[in-house]
Amino acid sequence: MTRFSFKIHATDGKARTGAIQMMRGEIRTPAFMPVGTAATVKAMKVEDVRASGADIILGNTYHLMLRPGAERVARLGGLHKFMGWDRPILTDSGGYQVMSLSDLRKITEEGVTFASHLDGSRHLLSPERSMEIQRLLGSDIVMCFDECPRADQPREVIARSMEMSMRWARRSRDAFDAGGEHAERSALFGIQQGALDEGLRKTSADALTDIGFDGYAIGGLAVGEGQEAMFATLDFAPQQLPADRPRYLMGVGKPDDLVGAVERGVDMFDCVLPTRSGRNGQAFTWNGPLNMRNARHAEDTGPLDERCPCPTCTKYSRAYLHHLHKSGEMLGAMLLTEHNLWFYQQLMAGMRAAIAEGRFAAFAADFRRDYFAR
């Protein structure tokens, strides 16, 4: 079986469609990865996540290292066996969550010392420890350890942060390669940094390319800069990365973010939005998002989305979903989460088909017309 390969099947402008082959299966691109923070995609069984069309899910190093602990997961047979998911898993490095603990962490060249949000216990997360945790979890796609600075900081601060992330990338590469059997069946992605600065992004991309990775992530976006600034950065950042490797935009995003990023050459995405929104009563549809707590749905016997074939849309009315969310019933969160994941996977499938058929521009225009019609 192939450890890791990426083949581009078709392009349309900057948009690409293809497939990643790994030992645990194929990942069709552009791909959206549901987020399974604590070894679960919230409110979903793994078989239902797969039924939605997901080829790969994301696990969170920070949360899993604290509870139940990477060593315990390893003793229990690894993350796949632990949660019952037999397809590829990408794990983040833990860096983003640790950096967000601004009052509870200290950054040095060695790594980041932080206090657990659970019990206050002290931990050091370094490139080497991050690689060890992801190996213990049994991740298929491992992410380098990096720092994600705020985009509104001075250029010299962002430059110093990026340069340290590149040194950490080298250490991540070395530690990953020393991982024995796990390194022989998994892949390692580097993470480009540099905030919104084209020159810093180019320096970062060149440093990562010199080290060499199976894929490349675009980090440091979707952290409050806004869609306009994000798209302006994506006008150049993906093209700075190797064209023959997958490009992964971390933490993105809203449906229109995904379309705009694919338009600019991105292949992979993850975001908590479809699951978190589902728990909070928001449904994504081809005609824009719906707030199912709104009284206008109270007697609506129609489905969430007439174009959606998901179990929620084929079995339940808007009125029933409104009732569940107004009543605080957990089934409401489950049904909207299931629908949202189906919607995201249908969006990705639609983009893949449109790119393959050379009609992506028309697909994107039609999507925006309908999605923003309200």
From Swiss-Prot:
Q: How is the cofactor bound?
A: Binds 1 zinc ion per subunit.
| Record has Metal-binding as a keyword | yes
Q: Which pairs of positions does the record mark as disulfide bonds?
A: none
The annotated region (RNA binding) lies at 251-257, 275-279
Q: Which GO terms describe its molecular function?
A: metal ion binding; tRNA-guanosine(34) queuine transglycosylase activity
Sorted alphabetically, the keyword list is:
Glycosyltransferase, Metal-binding, Queuosine biosynthesis, Transferase, tRNA processing, Zinc
Q: Which Pfam families match?
A: TGT
**Record's signal peptide:** none
Which positions in this protein are listed as binding Zn(2+)? C308, C310, C313, H339
Query: Which pathway does it serve?
Result: tRNA modification; tRNA-queuosine biosynthesis
Cofactor dependence: Zn(2+)
E.C. number: 2.4.2.29
GO cellular component terms given for this protein: cytosol
Q: InterPro entries this protein is in?
A: ArchSynthase1/Queuine_TRR (IPR050076), TGT (IPR004803), TGT-like_sf (IPR036511), tRNA_ribo_trans-like (IPR002616)
Q: Name one GO biological process term.
A: tRNA-guanine transglycosylation
- What reactions does this protein catalyze? 7-aminomethyl-7-carbaguanine + guanosine(34) in tRNA = 7-aminomethyl-7-carbaguanosine(34) in tRNA + guanine
Q: State the similarity comment.
A: Belongs to the queuine tRNA-ribosyltransferase family.
Quaternary state and interactors:
Homodimer. Within each dimer, one monomer is responsible for RNA recognition and catalysis, while the other monomer binds to the replacement base PreQ1.
| Entry function | Catalyzes the base-exchange of a guanine (G) residue with the queuine precursor 7-aminomethyl-7-deazaguanine (PreQ1) at position 34 (anticodon wobble position) in tRNAs with GU(N) anticodons (tRNA-Asp, -Asn, -His and -Tyr). Catalysis occurs through a double-displacement mechanism. The nucleophile active site attacks the C1' of nucleotide 34 to detach the guanine base from the RNA, forming a covalent enzyme-RNA intermediate. The proton acceptor active site deprotonates the incoming PreQ1, allowing a nucleophilic attack on the C1' of the ribose to form the product.
Under which name does UniProt file this protein?
Queuine tRNA-ribosyltransferase
Identify the coding gene.
tgt
